[in-house]
Amino acid sequence: MKYYLNLFSPSTWDHSRKKGSKITGFSIAQKTQAKNISVDSIFLCYLVRVSRWVGILKTTSESFQDNDPIFMEENDKYVIRFNVDPMVILDPDKGLPIKEEFIWNQLEWTKDKPIASPSWASHFQRSLREMPEKDGEFLYNLLLEQNTNQKEYPLTKRENRIISRKTTIITPSGEHEVDIPDDDEID
């Protein structure tokens, strides 16, 4: 079985879940790469900015192009899509943090790097990257187990702000909470 990285921002994860998680999408730049992914492949869903594994999607179709908005309310740039079976869909606070030692020390992309090192993140910059089979199997089984157990991994204040897309700013009139769009929501 082949395992592929599927990156989501907190916003696109939220939009996908609200639409039932039956379709996953990628940018038009990944059209050729998507054509090489076959039915029954596994997408391991990784929530960027909070660094958590949050889902398993199994492809039930070949890739196709569809411009209907799913992942953004308008101007959705994730138009190369797959129909998928949402095998595991976790809330962010149930997502598996990559920096948990039992995960970090197992994955080929991270195990030889210090947790504080920024170099590990280079592996998590683009969706559709094929994962080492051993890592894919490990995460697949771990996510299935987490889907059953639903162990909570509490979000930090920072992670909660990222997920809610809110931050506090200080102005001459005092502190104010403001919405911050994800990078993928800015034209």
Question: What function would you assign to each model-found segment?
Answer:
Residues 1-39, 47, 143-187:
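Compositionally biased, charged N-terminal/linker segments
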Residues 2, 53, 80:
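Residues that flank catalytic or metal-binding motifs in active/ligand-binding sites
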Residues 59-129:
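Aromatic- and Lys/Arg-enriched surface recognition patch
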Residues 111, 115-155, 169-171:
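C-terminal terminal-subdomain/extension
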